Amino acid sequence: MSIQLIYELAVPPTRMAEVHQLFADRYLPEASERGMNFTGAYITPPIELDDAPTTLVMQFTLPDANAVWAMKRQVTDSPEIAQFWLDVDGIVVSRQRRFLAPYERG
C-alpha cells in the first residue's frame, strides 16, 4: 500500500519562485535516495496571490509504511535537511506535513 506525503507551505506574495527553487535545488535531488517519488508541485488557490499567501503543495509517494520510517530516520540524521527546513521556515508563513494512506474498509 503506497503512502502519500504532502507538504503544504503558505508562501508570502512574491516568494513562490524562491521556495520552489529551494526544493528543486536542495530537497528533490536526494529525495529518491530516501525512497520518495516526487509526483508534483501544486498551488492553491490555482493562481499565485499578490496580496496574501499562496499555498504550495509538494506531493511525494513512498512505497509503504516501512519506507516512511526509513525516510524519517534519514531526514532526522541529516544536517543538510535540517538547514533546508530552517531556510524554508525563514520564508514561509507556515508549513504542514501530512502522510496519507488509502482507506480500506475492513
Model-derived segments and their meaning:
Residues 1-3, 10-15, 19, 32, ...:
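Short, low-complexity cationic-aromatic patches
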Residues 18, 67-70, 83:
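Short, solvent-exposed alpha-helical surface patches in well-structured domains
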Residues 15-41, 76:
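Short amphipathic alpha-helical segments
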Residues 29, 68, 78-81:
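Generic macromolecular interface patches on structured domains
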Residues 15, 66-68, 105:
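Residue-level signal for secondary-structure boundary sites
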Residues 36-55, 81-106:
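Glycine-rich beta-strand-turn "strand-cap" elements at beta-sheet edges
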Residues 23, 72, 85:
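Short, flexible helix/strand-to-coil boundary loops that buttress conserved ligand/catalytic motifs
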Residues 3-10, 39-76, 98:
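Short, well-ordered beta-strand segments in beta-rich or mixed alpha/beta enzyme
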